[in-house]
Amino acid sequence: MYPLDGSARPHPPGTTRLNSVEPDKQIGFTVLVRPQTGAPRLPDLAQWQAIPIAERQFLSTAGFERTYGSSEDDIVSVASFLEKAGMTIRSRHAGAGTVEVQAKTCQIHSVFAVQLLYYRGQLRPAARKRRDDKQPAEETYIGFEGCISLPAALHDKVIHIFGLDTRTFGASGGYSGDPPRAQRLIVAELAALYGFPAGVDASQQTIGIFSGEGNDDKGQSLSNYRPADVAAYFNNQTVGYNRAPTVVPVSLTVADQTYRNDPDHPTQELSQDIMTAATIAQGCTVNVYFSDLTEQGWLAFLTRVLFPQGEEKRPTIVSISWTMYDEQTYRDRLSFLFQRLAVVGTSVFAIAGDWGANNNIIDGQPHVGWPGSDPWVTCVGGTVVGNVRSSGAFTEHAWSDRDNPDSQFTIDGHLGVTGGGMSRVFATPPYQLSSGISAVTDCNGERWTGGRFIPDITGMVGFRGFIVNGKRNYFIGTSCSTPLYAGLFAALASALGGGGEGGVLFGPLNTVLYQIDRGVYRDITFGHNDSGDMPACAYFAAGEGYDTVSGLGSVDGRRTLEELRRIYWPKTKGFGCFRN
């Protein structure tokens, strides 16, 4: 037997080991098979950084499969071996390099020399809020000790196995002081202040939105949207922002669970994700991927983005309003999924989180959240816009509203601070190093070096005017600013003449954002991200230039289009329009 590199799954402090999983219990898991012999390595960030922005080329889904997919021989060999061991093969995909398997616990133990056990672990406070208050603030999950082992027949063919650890890692986002006269805005109002293009035909664009809540213990979906709400919302928007999207629910099966939309129980998080992104990207298609927050759930989601089925369109932009502190994730086991998406030109946005510098981890240390901390992902922080003048000028502060009873941007009376800091998992990426960003200093004067710094950009966190279950609603958090920018860059792609495969695609967007002229950003210089619940925990402050509270700043849509038009000029066909 050979140990499978990277398969160990250490359990967080406070986790209790319970009993062994029943021998006959059916477990669904995913086997990841090596790329075909002779396949090139996926381009890394340094390679993307070295290619002039307008000269970058991206593959189609079919091109990706031909270039980077697994060989059919390897897929068949792995599937046949597992079938002979008594396991059931549910599906296989050479392009993705995946084999979906159903097996009894005893069969898994026999083949992989791993004992599956039940564990009880604490849920993050943010995750607890979405569950029945009568339930304990913990989860019971399946896991194992040590690492997975491979028999000789699978050694070198299998590079990872997902699904033998079912813990949750992730929670939704939304739940100093504000500028004068700060109040929640309608998305279209903020778009006008930010100079976003209005009325651009984004019908060629597809935005993917992750709905990762899963189901409750009764099998009811915990994250849903209501088509009638989406229609009503856009019927109430002004011209230039009132073209409704085509929303496509994508049901995913993870292990033995299938997740799908339940329109009878719409939720705020997902509803506003759809409405915010599509307000900016007029007429776009929005694919909503229903999954869960397990490791296997993330794999199912990101693989489906790359390999759409049936009439689904492949997204060129993805928005993720879920996060988990990155020390509890397994970077090289999941980061490759974002690296894959870069090859086909897909850009991914994710929240910085709403809990400040400690990212909701009460251990006295700063933490950042994954997937925003992944260097392939554009991480979005939060600001508050206020003091809006008739000229369109305004004041913008970093979002820092812990225990601020006078603020419209505080959740439950005390929560609400933008995330940001330095990853302990991912190294400083080339695009930050080449921009002179190699260290930051916290409130105690300590220098942080060597890690990936987040956020990359930042934006307004408080919107009103959404319609959920037929009623007007508002939402607060970096879960607002993230789909906002997903919509912007979809609209910019259309304004530049792009759309779909063969058009203008941005791919690994951070390698663009850090190269273009800094004049496209509004530098945020006021505010901090003190979490406020651990007095000894270090935090960071906004200042001139890049900082780990507001990143490069908030994005000026007009200036960004002008800068990108200059870069992509040989390819551009249309220029969009602006609403002042």
UniProtKB/Swiss-Prot annotation:
The keyword Glycoprotein applies. Its cofactor is Ca(2+). Binds 1 Ca(2+) ion per subunit. The active site is at 269 (charge relay system), 273 (charge relay system), 479 (charge relay system). It catalyses: Release of an N-terminal tripeptide from a polypeptide. One of its GO terms (biological process) is proteolysis. Residues 1-21 are annotated as: Disordered. Disulfide bonds: none annotated. Pfam families: Pro-kuma_activ. Gene3D superfamilies: Peptidase S8/S53 domain (3.40.50.200). Residues 181-567 form the Peptidase S53 domain. The keyword Membrane does not apply. Keywords: Calcium, Glycoprotein, Hydrolase, Metal-binding, Protease, Secreted, Serine protease, Signal, Virulence, Zymogen. SMART domains: Pro-kuma_activ. GO terms for molecular function: endopeptidase activity; metal ion binding; serine-type endopeptidase activity; tripeptidyl-peptidase activity. Ca(2+) binds at residues 523-524, 543, 545, 547. Secreted tripeptidyl-peptidase which degrades proteins at acidic pHs and is involved in virulence. PANTHER family: PROTEASE S8 TRIPEPTIDYL PEPTIDASE I CLN2, TRIPEPTIDYL PEPTIDASE SED3 (AFU_ORTHOLOGUE AFUA_3G08930). This is Tripeptidyl-peptidase sed5. It comes from Aspergillus fumigatus (strain ATCC MYA-4609 / CBS 101355 / FGSC A1100 / Af293).
